[in-house]
Amino acid sequence: MPVNIQIYNSDCIEYIKTLDDNSIDLVLTDPPYFIDKLDNKWSSDEINGEKKNSHIKHLPKGMKFDKKQVKKLYDYYLELSELLFTKLKPGGYFLSFSSPRLYHAIAMACDIAGFEIRDMINWNYTQSMPKGMSVTHIINKMDMSPEDKVNLIEEYKDFKTPQIRSCFEPICVAMKPIGKLTFIKNELNFKTGLLDFSQKVGIGNDRVPANIITTEEYNETYDKNFLVSKPGKREKGENNTHITVKPIALIEHLIKLFSKKGSTVLDPFLGSGT
């Protein structure tokens, strides 16, 4: 069956308003995470400009804490979720990638908009950098004797700021309720709701999909799950500067699991085009 891919250069909120109600089978997206300046109004030029500044003054993304972030994300995602709720068919799924720190805002927005939170999928990976920072540079600026500084640095040499190395991204699995219909009756009416477990995963391709998706072989327990590596330079493309590119294999897996052949899949946020 030929694949019909259509790309629209538009504000996603405004474009989604033009879609017919109950016309979408699956929404699968990697939205702005609203961490630091990475919100719905973020500028690539502004973000790239900050990277040229000092590492200490301008901390890496995700290390600054602003209580307004979660409120801004919730408000924006509630508006989006309420709009998508009308466009999805009953039993249609809304899958949203997020960060562990702000996942709750996305899940709550989907819930309040009317969706059922059916599950959370964890995409686990090990190719990540530690974010916790040493406090040595702060101690060196403190008003105390050189000897006291040396002693304090030694005492806290193994302590870092409270950012645990992140090795997973959560995916919120929300579903538009099917009302009083059974899943099979809803399936016959809309071709949505039931999951396609025909694809087998794991090392031996003999396991049904789980809610943990890993990037590599950890041990026997993790081997039972679906292994998906982060995309390398070849898959990303030479000119792709997007900071959170998702693997094609991961997106393919989710589309096959949560939709059928011929389904209409919507991604409100283009990102790098995965």
Describe each PLM feature range.
Residues 3-274:
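Core catalytic lobe of class I
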